């Protein structure tokens, strides 16, 4: 009985230290997670600073050519600034209202798209070579995770992420 009381005090103290640490360091972060077999795995975490660059590279599933999407984090959400691609096709921007279109270095480029996206949800696919570059670091997700793996990229506080991990759901 005495041992259980000591153990509970230790658990309480450790929990209190963790929660205090999270409150003190509760800076907004960008999380990249991969869901495998119902378990969320953290792939990367970076400080959610304004103008943080994010690049998504993949092979278009229909055209079988490279696509590069360039985004930046504005402090609250992601802004799709530019899309570069090698061939026109389904799902690729082409209308005047999509932005400013031009050709450069063998790529079709749609600049000044300025589309806001709060959270990104991607999937690894057969032959798509899904890769992201976040704050200068490259993650070849297609090499790390099986085909069909859900990849989420979103801003959240460390404290909120801690409680999601404990409770098991977003609130």
Task: Tell where the protein language model's regions lie, with residue ranges.
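Hydrophobic membrane-insertion alpha-helices, especially the h-region
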Residues: 11-26
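Short, surface-exposed beta-strand-loop junctions and turns on beta-sheet-rich folds
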Residues: 62, 86-88, 116-117
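An acidic-aromatic
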Residues: 68-110
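Mature, soluble, non-transmembrane domains
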Residues: 94, 98-171
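A short, sequence-level motif marking secondary-structure junctions
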Residues: 47-50, 74, 86, 125-127, ...
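N-terminal secretory signal peptides
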Residues: 36-84
């Amino acid at each position: 009985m005495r041992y259980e009381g000591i153990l509970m005090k230790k658990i309480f103290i450790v929990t209190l230290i963790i929660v205090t640490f999270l409150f003190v360091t509760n800076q907004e972060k960008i999380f990249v997670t991969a869901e495998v077999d119902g378990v969320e795995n953290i792939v990367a975490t970076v400080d959610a600073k304004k103008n943080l660059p994010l690049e998504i590279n993949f092979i278009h599933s229909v055209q079988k050519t490279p696509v590069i999407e360039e985004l930046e984090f504005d402090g609250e959400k992601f802004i799709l600034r530019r899309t570069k691609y090698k061939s026109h096709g389904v799902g690729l921007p082409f209308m005047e209202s999509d932005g400013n279109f031009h050709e450069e270095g063998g790529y079709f480029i749609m600049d000044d798209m300025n589309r806001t996206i709060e959270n990104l949800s991607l999937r690894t696919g057969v032959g798509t070579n899904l890769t992201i570059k976040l704050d200068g670091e490259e993650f070849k997700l297609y090499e790390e995770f099986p085909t069909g793996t859900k990849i989420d990229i979103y801003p959240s506080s460390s404290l909120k992420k801690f409680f999601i991990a404990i409770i098991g759901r977003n609130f």
